[in-house]
């Protein structure tokens, strides 16, 4: 289990300055986003990614394994408490007005 971070980045999220990284490669069974532009989830059989609205307002999630994506608050696309993404999926999320919205995706199944 590991987290590999790339280029350090300073971002302004919800009026707070956050020290984070542009990208993270995640090999954990559960991970909470931390302001990254992109995360890649790999080397685990399944993982749960929690979209943290306090530290993240926009993120791309690339899955190299099956993942469950949950918001810390609100819903995804105003309807879903969680979504399931199959291996090789790529999904772009934006937090707005208390919910997470899918801006772009491939490989999604009905959750």
Each language-model region and where it sits:
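Parallel beta-helix/beta-solenoid repeats that form elongated, surface-exposed shafts/blades used
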Residues: 1-2, 81-83
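Surface-exposed loop/turn and secondary-structure junction residues enriched for glycine/proline
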Residues: 34, 79, 86-87
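Extracellular disulfide-bonded cysteine-rich modules/repeats
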Residues: 87-97
């Amino acid at each position: 289990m590991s987290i590999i971070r790339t280029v350090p980045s300073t971002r302004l999220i919800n009026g707070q300055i956050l020290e984070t990284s542009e990208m993270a490669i995640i090999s954990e069974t559960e991970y909470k986003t931390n302001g990254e532009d992109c995360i890649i989830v790999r080397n685990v059989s399944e993982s749960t990614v929690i979209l943290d609205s306090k530290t993240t307002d926009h993120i791309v999630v690339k899955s190299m394994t099956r993942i469950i994506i949950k918001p810390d608050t609100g819903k995804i696309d105003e309807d879903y408490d969680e979504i399931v993404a199959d291996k090789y999926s790529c999904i772009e999320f934006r937090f707005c007005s208390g919910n997470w919205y899918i801006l772009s995706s491939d490989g999604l199944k009905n959750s």
